[in-house]
Amino acid sequence: WPMIMVVNASGTPAASYEPFFPRLASWGFIVVGNEDGQAGNGETASITLDFMLNIPADSVLSGKIDYDSMGIIGYSQGGAGAICAVTNFENGARYKAMFTGSAAYQTLAKNMGWEYDPAKIKIPYFMAAGTGKSDDSGNDPEKGYGGVSPLSAQIANYNCISDEVQKVRARAVGAEHEQMLMRSDGYMTAWMLYQLTGNEEGESVFLGENAE
């Protein structure tokens, strides 16, 4: 089965949003998380991936994971954590695709100790954020706090990534920062179905004449 690693938002261990996991798993994924509430530097995601790559033979998951079809997703601080997990750790090369919801923008992430370089992203990447004030305050993020994931910073991240990499950016109209897990859920699921399983319906959301 394809596997998805989930990197937590600030102060949000996996147990605090437990229903998210079986819902995503119902689409045919093994969904993995941890209890780290400060996951922005990607370290605990990397440690958790190491554990999953070395599942004990007596585990119920032994022999069940398709290690060639693994994705990673993260929200807010966890968005920065997902990028860091992919780009700053050796085992990050095992991931096939990534999604982030309202990932902390670069300056904010750097100030918080979660520095990342989007130019190092080499796998298909779907980035989403909201248009609400908590994600984009309207202020210049280079001169002050611009919200967690302002449009200008998202565009800058997008442009840093090679055009040879499949990349998608989107904004959820009217969505505030804390709403992005729910507002982006269907699109995130479609992205992972497309990237990890080749699902044609998922692909049609992003490619083709009727793509959204």
Residue positions per predicted region:
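Gly/Ser-rich "nucleophile elbow"/oxyanion-hole loop immediately N-terminal to the catalytic nucleophile
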Residues: 1, 43-80, 88-92
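Short beta-strand element of the alpha/beta-hydrolase
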Residues: 1-9
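Short amphipathic alpha-helix adjacent to the substrate-entry channel of hydrolases
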Residues: 15-34
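Active-site signature of alpha/beta-hydrolase-fold catalytic machinery across serine-
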Residues: 19, 84-88
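Surface-exposed patches in mature extracellular/periplasmic domains of secreted proteins
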Residues: 34-36, 57-64, 198-209
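Hydrolases whose catalytic domains are alpha/beta-hydrolase-1, hotdog thioesterase
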Residues: 81-85, 109
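The feature captures the conserved acid-bearing segment of alpha/beta-hydrolase catalytic domains
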Residues: 93-181
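Alpha/beta-hydrolase-fold serine-hydrolase catalytic core, especially in secreted/extracellular enzymes
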Residues: 164-165, 173-212
